[in-house]
């Protein structure tokens, strides 16, 4: 199970790193009215590169963890709401794909709410487009999961618990080694 957490961390860092570097560069070298565009572009490139890697014949991941890394830099205020919705959805449905799509949507809605009237100002248009486009793209990448959910065949998350000593004794007594 810890491998999954490790991969999640690496994918998040894959999005966080270029976005963070672009944010630092932009804040030091670009006019305030265009500082957000470079980190948004870097984040989009990281997400698209994860979803459609050339070296894997354009067959990559769904982009959720990479988007998380990008969002931590671009819109940290929206991460909490998306994360809570992710956890609640997994707890209620045991479906990570559904939780990922809901969290992406909650991020977009939360970020647009946070931007408010500023969402249409030129310096925030790239962030507005990101808040709308990335959740749509993440949902698009989950098409096969959506089809399985509709058929009732989407796998649920299960807890893997190490067998207790009493389970081992029961197995030995029943002859199921």
What are these regions (language model features)?
Residues 1-16, 51-65, 91-102, 141-177:
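Interhelical loop and helix-boundary elements at the membrane-water interface
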Residues 4-5, 36-44, 68, 80-84, ...:
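Hydrophobic alpha-helical transmembrane segments
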Residues 7, 43-50, 86-90, 107, ...:
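Alpha-helical transmembrane segments of multi-pass membrane proteins
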Residues 17, 24, 39-59, 64-73, ...:
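Anionic-ligand binding patches
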Residues 20-41, 72-79, 113-129:
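Helix-coil boundary and interhelical linker segments in multi-pass alpha-helical membrane proteins
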Residues 59, 83-87, 118-127, 147-154:
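A cytosolic-side transmembrane-helix exit/cap motif
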């Amino acid at each position: 199970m810890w491998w999954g957490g490790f991969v999640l961390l690496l994918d998040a860092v894959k999005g966080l790193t270029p976005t963070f570097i672009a944010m630092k560069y932009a804040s030091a070298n670009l006019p305030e009215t265009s500082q957000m565009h470079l980190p948004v572009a870097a984040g989009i490139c990281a997400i698209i590169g994860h979803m459609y890697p050339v070296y894997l014949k354009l067959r990559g991941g769904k982009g959720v963890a990479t988007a998380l890394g990008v969002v931590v830099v671009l819109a940290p205020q929206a991460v909490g709401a998306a994360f809570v919705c992710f956890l609640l959805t997994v707890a209620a449905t045991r479906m990570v794909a559904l939780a990922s799509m809901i969290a992406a949507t909650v991020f977009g809605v939360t970020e647009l709410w946070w931007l408010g009237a500023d969402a249409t100002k030129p310096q925030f248009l790239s962030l507005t487009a990101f808040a709308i486009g990335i959740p749509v793209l993440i949902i698009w990448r989950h098409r096969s999961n959506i089809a399985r959910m509709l058929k009732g065949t989407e796998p649920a998350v299960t807890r893997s618990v190490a067998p207790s000593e009493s389970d081992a004794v029961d197995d030995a007594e029943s002859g199921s080694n």
